[in-house]
């Protein structure tokens, strides 16, 4: 006896008191090339194989396939199977329609989750960069949603927006992303800022970039020359006080250091003559493209610097017991 819910075969002798469920013999006998030398309590497979359990029309009235169902009950062969398939056609069509509807609904839900609706602005969902200095920003509308979906990045500027939650949960201020540099302000022309200052000194080479040198052209000489004979021209202090066009945040004029060539020539002349006469001063100013006053002030500061160096050198040698 073959039980569909069991994984093994049971001999009919075990159920002698029960009536046999199979009232008719097997309609499809199969033979196998191997011999069935099985145990006595195991029934051979060919005795229980391919029983026509559900092919009677009386047991399955809803299948009503007409001639197909009758043919299946009589023969059970290929002809009956082919005729019975006509009774399943409505059920197959309904199942196929239901599967197609489910697939369409799933696809629509997936598209709705991925792409934003047409009514909403895509820049709300995707953090579009703000336009800088009136530059044209990205296009708005449903057409930009698809491009923003692949090109939009999160607030870190590198990873997609799905990683923003990690930056929000991280301690410290949130990463603001690469910030665009502000446009540099137009530089104020020096002539407009220094209109109130009179041009120092007299003549000689007005085209020099160092035409408006300060009393301290050298880095150390300016700081060390205070209180001496080279304080600077008296007209500059009055110009700084009365110059209304000078910017308030700038208390002194911009430093204009000398070039290496100018410093080398001035140092060479200072090595031979600590005090320079007017003729030599005019000659240097023409050769170095400087004004007469610039050369004069440089020598004043250089003398103060040499005086301070001599004083420091003397203190070092007298304070050190080894000398």
Curated annotation (Swiss-Prot):
Keywords: Developmental protein, DNA-binding, Homeobox, Nucleus, Transcription, Transcription regulation. Residues 211-222 have a biased composition (Low complexity). Transmembrane segments: none annotated. Signal peptide: none annotated. Residues 223-235 have a biased composition (Gly residues). It comes from the Eukaryota. GO terms for cellular component: nucleoplasm. GO terms for molecular function: DNA binding; DNA-binding transcription factor activity, RNA polymerase II-specific. GO terms for biological process: anterior/posterior pattern specification; branching involved in ureteric bud morphogenesis; cartilage development involved in endochondral bone morphogenesis; cell development; chondrocyte development; chondrocyte differentiation; developmental growth; dorsal/ventral pattern formation. Residues 164-255 are annotated as: Disordered. Residues 171-189 have a biased composition (Pro residues). The keyword Transcription regulation applies. CDD domains: homeodomain (cd00086). This is Homeobox protein Hox-D11.
């Amino acid at each position: 006896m073959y039980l569909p819910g069991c994984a093994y075969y049971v001999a009919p002798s075990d159920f002698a008191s029960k009536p046999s469920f199979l009232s008719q013999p097997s309609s499809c006998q199969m033979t196998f090339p191997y011999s069935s030398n099985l145990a006595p309590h195991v029934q051979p497979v060919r005795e229980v194989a391919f029983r026509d359990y559900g092919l009677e029309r009386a047991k399955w009235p809803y299948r009503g396939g007409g001639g197909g169902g009758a043919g299946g009950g009589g023969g059970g062969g290929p002809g009956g199977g082919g005729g019975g398939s006509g009774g399943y056609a409505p059920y197959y069509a309904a199942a196929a329609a239901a599967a197609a509807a489910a697939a369409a609904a799933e696809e629509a839900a997936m598209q709705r989750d991925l792409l934003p609706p047409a009514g909403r602005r895509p820049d709300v969902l995707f953090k579009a960069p703000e336009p800088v200095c009136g530059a044209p920003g990205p296009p708005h509308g449903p057409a930009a949603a698809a491009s923003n979906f692949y090109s939009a990045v999160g607030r870190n500027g590198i990873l997609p927006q799905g990683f923003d939650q990690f930056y929000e949960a991280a301690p410290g201020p949130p990463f603001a992303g690469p910030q665009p540099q502000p446009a540099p302000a137009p530089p104020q022309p020096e002539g407009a800022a220094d209109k109130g200052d009179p041009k120092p000194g007299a003549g000689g080479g007005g085209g020099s970039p160092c035409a408006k040198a300060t009393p301290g052209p050298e880095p150390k000489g300016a700081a060390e020359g205070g209180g001496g004979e080279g304080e600077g021209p008296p007209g500059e202090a009055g110009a700084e006080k009365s110059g209304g066009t000078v910017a308030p945040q700038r208390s002194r004029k911009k430093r204009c250091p000398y070039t290496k060539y100018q410093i080398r020539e001035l140092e060479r002349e200072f090595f031979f003559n600590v005090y320079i006469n007017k003729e030599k001063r005019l000659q240097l100013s023409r050769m170095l493209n400087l004004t007469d006053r610039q050369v004069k002030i440089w020598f004043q500061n250089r003398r103060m610097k040499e005086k301070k160096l001599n004083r420091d050198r003397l203190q070092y040698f007298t304070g050190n017991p080894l000398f």
